[in-house]
Amino acid sequence: MGIEKQTKLNHLMRNWPDGKIKSSVWLNTEGYGANFIQKYKSNNWIEAIGTGAFKKSGDEVSWAAALECLQKQLNSEVHVGGKTAIEFAGKAQYLKMKETSVVVLSNKKEALPAWMKKHNWNVKLDFKVKNLFKSNLDFGEKSNGFTVVDTDKASIIISAPERAYLEYLDELPKSASYTEAKEIMENMISLRPSMVQHLLENCTSLKVKRLFLHFAEKINHPWFKKLNLEKIDLGIGKRVIFKNGVLDKKYNITVPKDEPYEEV
């Protein structure tokens, strides 16, 4: 290997931390084209995770490293959200962390790359596209309900508790329960009213907004009194969320029969 090529290799390996994934897009941008990549693979310096993604040979990489690669190298808006983000924030202490499943979401139409879907991460990536918020909310901004956590040698963007709970409510009643949603809200003592207000005003789902306010009023944390409900569009008409349930007349949604509301 020539001196220049050896220098490029040394530079790459020195600046490639353990546990990190590099995409072919990133490598090409840094001046490592297909020929370099193939030679590094042949000489056992790097290994392909799948088409378009690489790790250092013999290195162990996690699902979080894959997500970090998407966010930082591939302009993806995929992030940890919903119930998993709630658990990360410690807002669901009574729940046992499900290490076998991670909720990953995007607010724009995109798909996980094949290498991320096919690789065995030892967890199930429960990926969904949710158009829950207006598209003018820039991804990753703390002011739009995101935060950054460090886990498994990776630094990843996840939903802050306010946003995560709204994402979670979108799963009711199909894959989340009323009782669990109420118990999680009981732990949401320290939500930021300004953030809640901002996200509710920019949420596109009437169901989610009504459910959030239903639970928030029911638990009645101090931050709830600081919300300006007049600025939140709740639409008109009833929404049957739980069949054969009872009606919460204020928010026009049906809830389970054991709740103290009028039967529908």
Q: Could you say what each language-model-derived stretch is?
A:
Residues 1-83, 189-206, 263:
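Short beta-edge/loop segments at beta->alpha junctions of small alpha/beta modules
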Residues 10, 58-59, 134-138, 154, ...:
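N-proximal short alpha-helices
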Residues 16, 26, 36, 43-45, ...:
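Bulky hydrophobic/aromatic packing residues
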Residues 19, 99-100, 248:
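Sequence-level motif detector for i,i+2 pairs with an aromatic at +2
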Residues 24, 38-43, 48-137, 253:
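Short gly/ser-rich loop at a beta-strand->alpha-helix junction or flexible surface loop bordering the NTP-binding
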Residues 139-264:
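Hydrophobic alpha-helical interaction segments
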